């Protein structure tokens, strides 16, 4: 009798597997993501699943160094292979650097200029001043600065708190003609676009002078309202998309894994159409990200 019960129980488990999706054998390639209950991807497959932990990194994991005339810089994402990262955070293909840059209280940088590099800097903590090519501008949280190649600049922090920025660097190619003056932008003056991927509330930057990037790249501040979830979705070859948390600590659905994402932490979506990403504001606190979309896949 006991044996019959065990056999019946085993058959019931097999039937349940048939209803919910067969447990597949060992796979040789990562399955496509799907919401279907009988999809192969409704099980995890560690042998072939993308190791998404390599694609998310916090600046705290990097050692500080001096750069760009006196900033204290710490890498978040670095050049590498977005399909097979050689180490954590080494996922950049098109841009040169993605990092945190900070000025200590009551300090400033020395004059700095590069003829081959352009910088986008977004303030996420503190306030200060930038001088570039004869222009001056106050900067604070909510603002961004674009510094073209060939323009000398300095930053100043007259306050008693750190000035912290997200710095994105790109190299220009031969024949590229950069702008001749800096651009200053502010997302707080922009009417929001609501509802992309269910829950994103996006604001681009309103610039005094439109920046001229060498890459097909754009930036925006994106929020998610209290207790809401963004649609998990994937990206393919040629898409270099990065999300950096600026405010709040969110939940991140990343492939078939779940992460906390903290301020100063950024992730790049693997461009293989295998890894859905979707952020969740599970709290009653504000959530804000810096979005970067470098869309080489949209070039004709």
Task: Spell out what each predicted region is.
Residues 149-174, 271-298:
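Ligand-binding loop in jelly-roll beta-barrel domains
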Residues 102, 114-130, 221-225, 235-252:
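Short, conserved beta-strand element in jelly-roll/cupin
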Residues 8-29:
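Bacterial Sec-dependent signal peptides at the C-terminal "C-region" and cleavage site
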Residues 134-149, 256-271:
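Short acidic-glycine-tyrosine-enriched beta hairpin
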Residues 86-90, 108-115, 156-157, 230-236, ...:
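Short histidine-centered beta-strand/loop micro-motifs
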Residues 23-94, 110-111, 160, 168-218, ...:
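A short, N-terminal "cap"/entry segment at the start of jelly-roll beta-barrel domains
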Residues 1-4:
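Positively charged n-region of N-terminal signal peptides that target proteins for export
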């Amino acid at each position: 009798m006991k044996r019959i019960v065990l056999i019946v129980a085993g058959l019931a488990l097999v039937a349940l597997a048939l209803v919910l999706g067969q447990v597949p054998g060992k796979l040789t390639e990562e399955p496509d993501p799907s919401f279907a209950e009988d999809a192969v991807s409704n099980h995890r497959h560690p042998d072939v699943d993308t190791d998404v932990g390599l694609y998310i990194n916090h600046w705290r994991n990097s050692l500080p160094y001096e750069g760009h005339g006196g900033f204290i810089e710490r890498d978040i994402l670095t050049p590498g292979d977005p399909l097979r990262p050689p180490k954590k955070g080494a996922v950049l293909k098109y841009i040169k650097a993605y990092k945190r840059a900070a000025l200590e209280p009551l300090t400033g940088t020395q004059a700095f200029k590069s003829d081959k590099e352009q910088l986008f800097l977004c303030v996420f903590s503190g306030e200060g001043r930038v001088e570039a090519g004869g222009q001056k501008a106050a900067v604070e949280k909510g603002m961004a600065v674009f510094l073209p190649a060939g323009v000398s600049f300095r930053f100043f922090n007259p306050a008693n708190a750190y000035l912290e920025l997200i710095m994105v660097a790109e190299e220009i190619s031969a024949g590229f003609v950069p702008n001749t003056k800096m651009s200053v932008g502010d997302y707080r003056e922009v009417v929001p676009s609501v509802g992309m991927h269910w829950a994103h509330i996006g604001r681009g930057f309103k610039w005094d002078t439109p920046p001229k990037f060498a890459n097909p790249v754009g930036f925006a501040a994106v929020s998610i309202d209290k207790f809401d979830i963004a649609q998990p979705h994937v990206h393919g070859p040629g898409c270099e998309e990065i999300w950096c948390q600026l405010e709040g600590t969110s939940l991140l659905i990343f492939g078939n894994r779940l992460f906390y994402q903290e301020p100063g932490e950024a992730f790049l979506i693997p461009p293989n159409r295998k890894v859905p990403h979707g952020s969740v504001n599970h709290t009653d606190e504000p959530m804000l990200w810096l979005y970067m979309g470098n869309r080489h896949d949209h070039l004709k």
